[in-house]
Amino acid sequence: MLLIHELERIMEQHTERLIRLAFYYVRDLQSAEDIVQDVYIKFYDNQQNYEERGELKAYLSKLVSNRSKDYLRSWTYRKIQVQQKIFPQQTVMRRDMLVQQDERTLIENAILALPFKQREVIIHFYFEEMPVIDIAELLTIPESTVKTRLRRGRELLKLQLQHVEWEVLLHE
């Protein structure tokens, strides 16, 4: 049984990364934070089911990925999508508050615009720094499928970002 200070240490180590992962799935910071909080509660309540044969980082990432997918299928998410279509200005203002207007924002937006399957593997590969074999295992798909989704995702990103004059390159 985990002690509270052990759980706090785990949360300090993983929370920021897990929120970022959830955000890339659900595209909303508040929902991402809620998802991570739910995952920690589930992890604490069901810790006897956790087998320490794998990495805790991968286990928590899997929980966040699954919970994010559940959220995307939920009625709550669909209701928010309808509200954002009715009140689009609020969505734009909220997003501007969350993300800085720099090259990273352009890349993040391009990633968020990717189809779900490509976005999912791009996030795990580049942001979670997971090798292809681990992504395949996490998503229960063949390695070749992961590689194909990575290649297609990169191609789509290249198309989306080819018109950008990168500030960092202009000052070299």
PLM feature spans:
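Internal acidic/polar
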Residues: 78-107, 112, 131, 170-171
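A short, charge-rich alpha-helical start-of-domain segment used by transcription regulators
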Residues: 1-20, 36, 44
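Hydrophobic-face residues of short alpha-helical interaction/recognition segments
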Residues: 18, 22, 47, 60, ...
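Arg/Lys-rich amphipathic alpha helix in sigma70-family domain 2
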Residues: 65-83, 100, 152
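A short pre-motif secondary-structure segment
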Residues: 121-125
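Structural recognition of an alpha-helix C-terminal capping motif at a helix-to-coil junction
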Residues: 34-41, 54-66
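Short, aromatic/basic-enriched loop-to-helix "N-cap" motif that marks the start
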Residues: 48-62, 77-80, 143
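C-terminal edge and immediately downstream basic/flexible tail or linker adjoining helix-turn-helix-like DNA-binding
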Residues: 1-8, 79-82, 137-140, 154-172
